[in-house]
């Protein structure tokens, strides 16, 4: 049987980090087994579902490289199908109409709570065989078995068993003809021929109810795998403040999609002590039943380390487009400065994110705005003008503006003046960048460009003379 998995987000919000991990695990399991990965948009919550959220989910999936093998399925386009299946269950005596008012249902709930029982529907309409009538309280309920147990072997959690007496007759169709979650997902997974249902363990209590629906429909039962939660760094439930943000905010913060993928896969799965995987290695090695049953903790320092690894090792040509995007987000005209690939080579060892790289790269695309006064006091003081004047003369006279020629010129100054290279580099570094920290000084000057470098040296000389 061909493996078919699905990711089924609800577009009531954006794709968060937990959902992205679920999508990744579904995608990897399908790819490893040469199966199909499908996407379903569970958009039946008409009050909260938005097109903006749908678009954001699709965009995030594309950014992460989690391609799906068939067009997305939208639940709102399948309302007629849910009604057909509900009608079949009614005809077979496996479901029934109920017309209980909200007050009646609330009274049932309160009575159960007073006696210490779990709130549940008491089955008042189960045997009444009530006919259809136009009523705002009309629902269709599934006749859950009263006896026996529901048992299944979860690929992550192991054997799970619950008595049917613990389950009530759940609503499957609302008064407006829209399905409930538990009903829709069973019909969808059946129609989509899903063989492995991989989802968060917040759905595990729904599974016995869904299994009974599968049996009632005579539908083949998929295998279930319920993923543990992702907690924040303090071990608490994720919030937007502690990491449960829109996946695209990770892009906006400067993380690479393959770095995020590499990090996410390790939140619950491992292959020995190996930390870094390319995508093909993940496809070859990942197995859903190897996922840990315990909750994983977010570790932003580890994500930063993984991201920096790829910044250091990826081809600069592949890093250039996302760097350009980050530069443009800062309002920078990339054509006004050095080639992005050169910037990457200059900064890749010094930053963890592309956002940080873009911030540091501003010195090569924008006029120098200010000086670090501590750096000025230390390096732009009387006496420093000698090295700067020599630098200006030699840099202006270079036959070609190359990093090697710049480096040779600066070393010539140190030799001529019989001073250490630091006495040349540090005043020049402050003149060019406004700070006393930068990449290699020759490379820093080269990326600034001849005309801009000379202009900044002139400004530094004026600053020294007026100090």
Swiss-Prot record:
InterPro entries: aa-tRNA-synth_I_cd-bd, aa-tRNA-synth_I_codon-bd_sub2, aa-tRNA-synth_I_CS, aa_tRNA-synth_I_cd-bd_sf, Glu-tRNA-ligase_bac/mito, Glu/Gln-tRNA-synth, Glu/Gln-tRNA-synth_Ib_cat-dom, GluQ/Sye. GO terms for molecular function: ATP binding; glutamate-tRNA ligase activity; tRNA binding; zinc ion binding. Gene3D superfamilies: 1.10.10.350, HUPs (3.40.50.620). It comes from Xylella fastidiosa (strain M12). Its EC number is 6.1.1.17. Catalyzes the attachment of glutamate to tRNA(Glu) in a two-step reaction: glutamate is first activated by ATP to form Glu-AMP and then transferred to the acceptor end of tRNA(Glu). HAMAP family: Glu_tRNA_synth_type1. GO terms for biological process: glutamyl-tRNA aminoacylation. This is Glutamate--tRNA ligase. The keyword Ligase applies. It catalyses: tRNA(Glu) + L-glutamate + ATP = L-glutamyl-tRNA(Glu) + AMP + diphosphate. One of its GO terms (cellular component) is cytosol. A motif ('HIGH' region) lies at residues 9-19. The gene is gltX. The lineage of its organism: Bacteria, Pseudomonadati, Pseudomonadota, Gammaproteobacteria, Lysobacterales. Belongs to the class-I aminoacyl-tRNA synthetase family. Glutamate--tRNA ligase type 1 subfamily. A motif ('KMSKS' region) lies at residues 237-241.
């Amino acid at each position: 049987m061909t493996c078919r998995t699905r990711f089924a987000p609800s577009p009531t919000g954006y794709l968060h980090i937990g959902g992205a991990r679920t999508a990744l695990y579904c995608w990897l399991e399908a790819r490893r087994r040469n199966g199909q990965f499908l996407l379903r948009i569970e958009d039946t919550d008409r009050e909260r579902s938005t097109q903006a959220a749908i678009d954001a989910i699709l965009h995030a999936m594309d950014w992460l490289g989690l391609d799906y093998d068939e067009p997305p399925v939208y639940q709102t386009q399948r309302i007629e199908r849910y009604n057909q299946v509900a009608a079949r269950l009614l005809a077979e005596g496996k479901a029934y109409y109920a017309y209980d008012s909200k007050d009646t249902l609330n009274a049932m709930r309160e009575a159960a709570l007073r006696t210490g029982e779990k709130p549940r529907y008491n089955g008042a309409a189960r045997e009444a065989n009530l006919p259809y009538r136009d009523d705002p309280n009309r629902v269709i309920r599934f006749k859950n078995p009263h006896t026996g147990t529901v048992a299944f072997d979860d690929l992550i959690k192991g054997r799970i068993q619950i008595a049917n007496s613990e389950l009530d007759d759940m609503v499957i169709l609302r008064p407006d003809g829209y399905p409930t979650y538990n009903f829709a997902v069973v019909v969808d997974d059946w129609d989509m021929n899903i063989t492995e249902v991989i989802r968060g363990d917040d759905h595990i209590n729904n599974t016995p109810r869904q299994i009974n629906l599968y049996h009632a429909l005579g539908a083949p039962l998929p295998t279930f795998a319920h993923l543990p939660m992702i907690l924040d760094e303090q071990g608490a439930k994720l919030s937007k403040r502690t990491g449960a943000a829109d996946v695209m905010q990770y892009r906006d913060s400067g993380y690479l999609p393959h770095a995020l993928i590499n990090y996410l896969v390790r939140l619950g799965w491992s292959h020995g002590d190996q930390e870094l995987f390319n995508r093909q290695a993940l496809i070859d090695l990942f197995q859903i039943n190897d996922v840990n049953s315990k909750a994983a903790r977010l570790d932003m320092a580890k994500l930063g380390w993984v991201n920096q690894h790829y910044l250091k090792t990826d081809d600069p040509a592949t890093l250039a487009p996302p760097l350009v995007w980050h530069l443009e987000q800062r309002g920078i005209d990339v054509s006004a400065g050095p080639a992005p690939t050169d910037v990457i080579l200059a900064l890749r060892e010094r930053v963890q994110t592309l956002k940080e790289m873009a911030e540091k790269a501003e010195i090569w695309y924008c006029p120098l705005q200010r000086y670090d006064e501590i750096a000025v006091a230390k390096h732009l003081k009387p006496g420093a003008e000698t090295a700067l004047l020599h630098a200006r003369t030699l840099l202006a006279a270079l036959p070609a503006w190359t990093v090697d020629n710049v480096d040779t010129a600066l070393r010539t100054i140190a030799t001529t003046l019989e001073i250490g290279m630091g006495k040349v580099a540090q005043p020049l570094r402050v003149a060019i960048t406004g700070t006393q920290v930068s990449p290699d000084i020759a490379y820093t000057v080269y990326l600034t460009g001849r005309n801009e470098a000379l202009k900044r040296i002139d400004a530094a000389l004026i600053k020294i003379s007026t100090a």
